[in-house]
Amino acid sequence: MELEARAEPRSPRAGRGEEEEDEDEELRLAKRRKVLCSEFAAVTSSDEAVASGFLAGSGWHLERALDAYFEAPMNEQTTAAAAGGGSAGPGSCIDLTADDTASNTSSSGADSKQQDDDSSFSLITWNIDGLDLGNLQERARGVCSYLALYSPDVVFLQEVIPPYLCILQRRAGGYTIIPGNVDGYFTAMLLKKPRVKVLKQEIIRFPTTSMMRNLLVVHVNISGNELCLMTSHLESTRDHSKERMKQLQIVLNKMQEESQSTTVIFGGDTNLRDSEVAKLGGLPKNITDIWEFLGKPQHCRYTWDTSSNTNLRIESKCKLRFDRLYFRPAAEGGHIIPRNMDLIGLEKLDCGRFPSDHWGLLCRFDVIL
């Protein structure tokens, strides 16, 4: 015998309360989806209609939607834009993965030659300005093009954001990628496979930072030599000079604590002024500023130069050596020696902007066998 289920009567006031909660939840969901659409559109240079289509198809998961977008052939991206009532736009014709095969083919000769040559290795450090979402897709492609061109063994990056990390993970398949965080903006280290063998890693948080800054430390082996690699983005702006100096002291202490049999290289966007280093009494005797070690070459002195780099479009013209590389050789002989240094990222892209508001630093090292 079936019994008819009857709902118990509820008061009109209780019903209104539940309806209001439902409406609030729907409003929060709508706002969240609008933010996701804006972020997707900014990264891909598409419109919100395209963003909505890819996000909806990926369960409103931003990273999955970006993966789907960058994996899609260009005609599918254009079709999605047309279906959404918008145009693909100038940015959406840039597919970061379309020329993967060509890039890998063109650089394979250089890669194999460098892997066979254990007498040298190269390193790039670069603040890629991921916080600037303008032309982000094309600027990211520009950075990846430099990585393909120079094929560095080690890359230090600062101001990486999650969508940019997705691009790097898809584009730089020949590298082990170690991020210093996964939220907000952070540093990342790229280590070429299989030449650079990762031994261990750690993240040291700066205890009094107000900008989520930390020190990413990775121990590796290159050509039989053990290295301790470190990168960081020290506290920004002139007003945070004291905090920046505290962070620098933590970095220098960590460099000195490492085993004397290990070569230590630190690099990143330090935001340092020379006067701040002087206030700390200069660098320890066993730690060298590589730019100074190489004779202070003027062509690569200023890595943040608003007189030449117009990305920020600010009227004041500043030239500062924010991006630096420090070196502590192994005590058991000079197995690794800095050879030269150059700036990269000096050419404007088709969008009329540079890959970043910072120039990158490319440094080459000799390995004494």
Curated annotation (Swiss-Prot):
The keyword Methyltransferase does not apply. Transmembrane segments: none annotated. CDD domains: TDP2 (cd09080), UBA_TYDP2 (cd14344). The keyword Nucleus applies. Binds 1 magnesium or manganese ion per subunit. One of its GO terms (cellular component) is PML body. The gene is TDP2. Its main location: nucleus. Can partially complement the absence of TDP1 due to its weak 3'-tyrosyl DNA phosphodiesterase activity. One of its GO terms (molecular function) is 5'-tyrosyl-DNA phosphodiesterase activity. Residues 1-17 have a biased composition (Basic and acidic residues). Its cofactor is Mg(2+); Mn(2+). The lineage of its organism: Eukaryota, Metazoa, Chordata, Craniata, Vertebrata. Keywords: Developmental protein, DNA damage, DNA repair, Hydrolase, Magnesium, Metal-binding, Nuclease, Nucleus. Residues 127-131, 233-238, 271-273 are annotated as: Interaction with 5' end of substrate DNA. DNA repair enzyme that can remove a variety of covalent adducts from DNA through hydrolysis of a 5'-phosphodiester bond, giving rise to DNA with a free 5' phosphate. Catalyzes the hydrolysis of dead-end complexes between DNA and the topoisomerase 2 (TOP2) active site tyrosine residue. Hydrolyzes 5'-phosphoglycolates on protruding 5' ends on DNA double-strand breaks (DSBs) due to DNA damage by radiation and free radicals. It is found in: Nucleus; Nucleus, PML body. This is Tyrosyl-DNA phosphodiesterase 2. It is an enzyme of class 3 (hydrolase).
